[in-house]
Regions:
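Bacterial N-terminal signal peptides that target proteins for export
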Residues: 1-10
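A solvent-exposed, acidic/Ser-Thr-rich amphipathic alpha-helical stretch
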Residues: 61-62, 66-135
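A beta-strand edge to alpha-helix "cap/lid" segment located at domain peripheries
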Residues: 25-35, 108-183
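Short beta-strand segments enriched in hydrophobic/aromatic residues
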Residues: 55, 69-70, 77, 136-138, ...
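Sec/Tat signal peptide C-region and signal peptidase I cleavage site
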Residues: 20-23
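Short, structured helix-loop boundary elements
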Residues: 4, 41, 87-90
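Bacterial N-terminal signal peptides
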Residues: 9-18
Length: 183
């Protein structure tokens, strides 16, 4: 009898505990956004600045770029609303910047001396971190340091990790004239 009571009590405890754990793992739909500090905003802005620098130089064979993402992070480009190749995980992200198995060779924007600029950055807190939207400009196209092109915008999801703020996902919405593409 005591064994049956102990099992019944344990089962009842599990029935209460498991849903509570499951509920605690994901924020409720009406969960309040995190309160970001001024330092959080600065660190997220620095993440975007580091992104530009890593992309423009293919530093550390593209792994400096890849390490700006979470281990399961995703970069997803779109051109005029059409999805492009999806880059997920460290190796694929290094390739997105021209590195990894590509070895930073024949990277068009690097060969032209292009620099990426990210103005109009808006950061919004969420229950799990923050989201952001930022425009993208490219300067130096075709080797002309005075040529600037608007190349759409990014939608970002940021999360704070033990290593600092990282991209959980980054979607580039390229808006290009038909048939024109930076080469």
């Amino acid at each position: 009898m005591k064994l049956q009571q102990a099992l019944t009590t344990a089962l009842a405890g599990l029935m209460v505990t498991i849903p509570a754990i499951s509920h605690a793992q994901k924020p409720a739909a009406n969960a309040k956004p995190l309160v970001l500090t001024a330092l959080d905003y600065i660190e997220i802005e620095q993440l975007v600045a580091k992104y530009s620098r890593a992309l423009d130089t293919c530093s550390n064979n593209g792994y400096d770029y890849a390490d700006l993402y979470t281990p399961d992070g995703v970069f997803a480009p779109e051109i005029n609303g059409k999805p492009g190749p999806r880059f997920e995980g460290r190796e694929r992200l290094a390739e997105a910047s021209g590195g990894g198995k590509l070895g930073c060779k024949n990277v068009p924007w690097i060969q032209q001396g292009v620099r990426h600029l990210y103005p109009n950055h808006v950061i919004t807190p969420t229950p799990t971190g923050a989201v952001g939207v930022v425009d993208m400009l490219m300067i130096g196209l075709g080797g002309d340091p005075n040529k600037i092109e608007y190349d759409g915008y990014y939608d970002d999801v940021y999360v704070k990790t033990p290593q600092g703020w990282r991209f959980k996902s980054r979607t580039h919405h390229a808006v290009l004239s038909e048939g024109l593409r930076v080469k």
